[in-house]
UniProtKB/Swiss-Prot annotation:
Protein's organism: Streptococcus pneumoniae serotype 4 (strain ATCC BAA-334 / TIGR4)
Record-given protein name: Phosphoenolpyruvate carboxylase
Active site feature: 138, 561
Top-level EC class: lyase
Gene Ontology MF annotations: magnesium ion binding; phosphoenolpyruvate carboxylase activity
Catalysis performed (reactions): oxaloacetate + phosphate = phosphoenolpyruvate + hydrogencarbonate
Cofactor list: Mg(2+)
Similarity field: Belongs to the PEPCase type 1 family.
Gene3D superfamilies, per the entry: Phosphoenolpyruvate/pyruvate domain
Keyword Ribonucleoprotein included in the entry's annotation: no
Length: 898
């Protein structure tokens, strides 16, 4: 029997009760704020939307005054937010409940460990597995921190709802507290008036560590080792989860990321983890009141106690407390040194020294019958030190390949080596770069020539990276990523810059050079690029110095925008197969970093299915993936959700490593041949419209809120790398975000339907083949399930209203092309799946959408009317911000919009 997703155990009746309470409170609060006739319009809007009377809905919205729009927009933006909180609370409850009753569910860690324990190499698999969620600052998280804090209060109150029902908590007080926070939300600015700075993004990310990661990651690691031990598997230093960070180091297209922000990101992370250690040591100090008149302590703990400055006469026999006081003093001194560069006392040189002191405490307890004392907080502190060190999360550096080329060209020219580097052929570039890397020890930047702002900025960042690695530990920065990598020279250019600051030499690399292959063309050529790189004796030395791992990043967003969903998915799948094979050929462990976004159009979708549908052998023992924008809040907003989602990552990775699927052995060639045919056609269909139709550019910009999104204060990074004059110049995130707002969800399905329909029409038996692929091939099943989900969130009636924003009839006519493909895609997906309706296999999401859709559908009509008024010049600058409120509300309702 196949396991159910944990969400499907959800108690829908409790969620509905909570949503009813929240809705009634919001209505009552809003009623008190508005004139009776305005509030009555809110009720009418809800009724019209529930009845799917879109014409009536449109008429009523059109009649609203600008002032009425203010409160009505807020109401319908807050309502889906409250529904989200209720669902999150129920999921958190279910996580605890199902674990406590020992109920199996899809991705449960205990079930996965039991499965892997049967393998001969179980210890090797579990010891070396490392899954890394990498937090990014991609601008799709539209909520202010103040709003996030308020929603956390409501979340905490709803966690108590079941106790309220049982009479264990005073109902009136609970109800009044809930009302108070909803009322504050109703009167709080939902969106930012000022654009975020990188420093704000760093601070915001740290909130997730304090609220969830610092609890969930050590807890999961402890449980991981405990479960392995229960099966006779002794793990020594397993780190199934470590954390990554882009904020402060990702400067691709973001001019505000500098050496200063890189340093600030690293030191802020350091401060967070050092404060955590300080707090945990103090808690142990309070707890460990053990007296030597009752139990003995080890010689090492006695020595630590002797060195302690805790000289209270009341501590003479409490040697553990005195030892912990000494440890805490060292931690505080270490924090001051690392952050303020000031020596204030005896400190730790490395996190490993801190770990050794904790091990001394642990061993003393074990030697003296204190086994139970090292469970819980103590063992999780040990895990935290192993995982987080003094740096918390490894920060990636990322920059566009064109920037690296410009910097190297300038260096070569100023050093008198070559004045026209950029004009050289690829072969000539590589020959020149390899000569500099292998034979010339000089530092090219050590000339008196004045450096451009670009070169000075890049060198400053790399110099800062080296300083941080020396101070906080080598793992604080492990990777530096090349966006839009297209060739071997792109990788060698980065190596030249790293050589300038001593991060690579002829024997080793202190950071890994990671190419990011993004477009369909670059992914197709990635095998050739990596073959050339792995053939270099110099690269082999660098890889050897990184434990024989070579990471490659895969770009989901740009490949989708470039060739459509089907083409993107298949090209990425084949690239992984080819790159894995090349790694095996050269004896290198190729690992993948998946640059996935929140939406299907950017590689999103259910994480477990996404990982378990990867090609065979593509997951060695490491996998990294980005966690972006609003997805971070949804997945990791509280410790229970964080634990569950991290558990899904770990279990999925293990399952893909050890489970041999039917599609891995029996029929892959047949399936792949079919996919090649279908994908080629899908690519052409997509490109013909997006890049081949001269009116498409105008259609996109006129029929979506892209201009409002570009001016939205939802991130430090600009919406485009350059002035937008074509679709290609637009970043993938606002591209996807805009289609989500207009409810077309175009990037997640366009080109899928017709390509499969044409294949089916060639031979009536082909539908049976596709159904067989759906039943037996996880990749294909995941692909179609994601399209199914995207279609369920689209609304072509609303999309038509956005199309009406186009003035030119030829431009407007593109809607019919999109609508026809939408209908074909829906019919084909249902035919292959064998279902009568969308989301037949996902009852949890279907129920969720059923009761939230009517509310945020209203926001689309409000947004449409506001855009019309803006274009007619009928909105003040303050009133134009209402469009941003509707963007926020729709994004909240969809939950994965960017």
């Amino acid at each position: 029997m196949s396991l159910q997703k944990l969400e499907n155990y959800s108690n829908k009746s409790v969620v509905q009760e909570e949503v009813l309470i929240l809705t009634e409170l919001l209505e009552d609060i809003t009623k008190n704020m508005l004139a009776p006739e305005t509030f009555e319009k809110i009720i009418q809007l809800k009724e019209l939307s529930t009845q799917e009377d879109y014409q009536g809905l449109n008429r009523l919205v059109t009649s609203l005054s600008n002032d009425e729009m203010v409160y009505i927009s807020r109401y319908f933006s807050i309502l889906p937010l409250l529904i989200n909180i209720s669902e999150d609370v129920d999921l958190a409850y279910e996580i605890n409940h199902q674990n406590n009753i020992d109920q199996d569910y899809l991705g449960k860690l205990s079930t996965t460990i039991k499965l892997v324990a049967e393998k001969e190499n179980a210890v090797e698999i579990l010891e070396h597995l490392n899954v890394v969620p990498v937090l990014t600052a991609h601008p799709t998280q539209v909520q202010r921190k103040s709003m996030l804090d308020l929603t956390n209060h409501i979340h905490s109150l709803l966690r108590k709802y079941r106790d309220v029902k049982l009479g264990l908590i005073n109902k009136d007080k609970w109800y009044n507290d809930l009302r108070r926070y909803i009322e504050i939300i109703m009167q709080t600015d939902m969106i930012r008036e000022k654009k975020l700075k990188v420093t704000n993004e760093i601070t915001n990310a740290m909130e997730y560590y304090n609220s969830s990661f610092l609890k969930a990651v050590p807890h999961l690691t402890t449980e991981y080792k405990r479960l392995a031990q229960a099966h006779g598997l002794n793990l020594k230093q397993a780190k199934p989860i470590t954390m990554g960070m882009w904020i402060g180091g990702d400067r691709d297209g973001n001019p505000f990321v500098t050496a200063k922000t890189l340093k600030q990101s690293a030191l802020t992370q350091c401060e967070v983890i050092m404060n955590y250690y300080d707090k945990k040591i103090y808690q142990l100090y309070r707890e460990f009141s053990l007296s030597t008149s009752i139990v003995n302590v080890s010689k090492q703990v006695r020595e630590m106690a002797r060195q302690s400055k805790d000289n209270s006469i009341y501590r003479e026999k409490e040697l553990y407390r005195r030892a912990l006081f000494d440890i805490q003093s060292k931690i505080q001194a270490t924090k001051t040194y690392l952050i303020e560069d000031e020596e204030v006392g005896t400190r730790y040189e490395t996190a490993n020294d801190f770990y050794k002191d904790l091990i001394a405490i642990r061993d003393s307890l074990l030697e003296n019958k204190g086994e139970s004392l090292i469970s819980g907080d103590f063992v999780e502190l040990l895990q935290a030190v192993e995982i987080f060190g003094f740096y918390l999360a490894s920060i990636d550096m990322r920059q566009d390949s064109s920037v690296y080329e410009a910097c190297v060209a300038e260096l070569l020219k100023s050093a008198g080596i070559h004045s026209r580097y950029s004009e050289l052929s690829e072969e000539e570039k590589c020959d020149l770069l390899l000569k500099e890397l292998e034979e010339d020890p000089r530092i090219l930047s050590a000339t008196h020539a004045e450096k451009s702002e670009l070169l000075a900025k890049e060198l400053a960042i790399f110099k800062t990276a080296r300083v941080l690695k020396d101070k906080l530990g080598d793992d604080v920065i492990r990777q530096t990523i090349i966006s839009h990598a297209t060739s071997l020279s792109d990788m060698l250019e980065l190596a030249i810059l790293l050589k300038e600051v001593g991060l690579v030499d002829t024997e080793r690399a202190r950071v890994q050079i990671v190419p990011l292959f993004e477009t369909i063309e670059d992914l197709d050529h990635s095998e050739e690029t990596m073959r050339k790189y792995l053939s270099l004796s110099l690269a082999k030395k660098w890889i050897d110095s990184r434990n024989n791992y070579q990471e490659i990043m895969l770009g989901y967003s740009d490949s989708n925008k470039d060739g459509g969903y089907l083409s993107s998915c298949w090209t990425l799948y084949k690239a992984q197969q080819q790159l894995t094979a090349i790694g095996d050929e050269f004896g290198v462990k190729v690992t993948f970093f998946h640059g996935r976004g929140g939406t299907v159009g950017r590689g999103g979708g259910p994480t477990y299915e996404a990982i378990t549908s990867q090609p065979l052998k593509s997951i060695k023992d490491r996998i990294r993936l980005t966690e972006q924008g609003e997805v971070i809040g949804n997945k990791y907003g509280n410790k229970d959700a964080a634990y569950y989602n991290l558990e899904m990552l770990v279990s999925a990775a293990i399952n893909r490593m050890i489970t041999q699927k039917k599609s891995d052995t029996n029929t892959p060639n047949r399936y792949e041949t079919i996919m090649d045919q279908v994908v080629d056609r899908s690519y052409d269909i997509y490109r013909d419209l997006v890049f081949g139709n001269e009116h498409f550019y105008d259609y996109f910009f006129e029929s979506s809120p892209i201009k409002a999104i570009s001016s939205f204060n939802i991130g430090s990074r600009p919406a485009a790398r350059k002035t937008i004059t074509e679709i290609g110049g637009l970043r993938a995130i606002p591209w996807v975000f805009s289609w989500s707002q207009s409810r077309v969800m175009f990037p997640g399905w366009y080109g899928v339907g017709s390509s499969f329909k044409e294949f089916i029409n060639k031979n009536p038996e082909n539908i049976a083949i596709l159904r067989d692929m759906y039943q037996n091939w996880p990749f294909f099943q995941s692909l179609l399930s994601n399209v199914d989900m995207v279609l369920s969130k689209s609304n072509m009636n609303i999309a038509f209203e956005y199309a009406k924003l186009c003035e030119d009839e030829q431009v407007k006519a593109i809607y019919e092309t999109i609508l026809n493909e939408w209908q074909v895609t829906k019919n084909v997906i249902l035919a292959i799946e064998g279902h009568d309706e969308l989301l037949a296999d996902n009852p949890y999401l279907k129920a969720s959408l059923d009761y939230r859709m009517p509310y945020f559908n209203i926001l689309n009509y409000i947004q449409l009317e506001l855009i019309k008024r803006q274009r007619r010049g009928e909105l003040s600058s303050d009133q134009e911000r209402l469009i941003h409120i509707t963007i926020n509300g729709i994004a909240t309702g969809l939950r994965n919009s960017g």
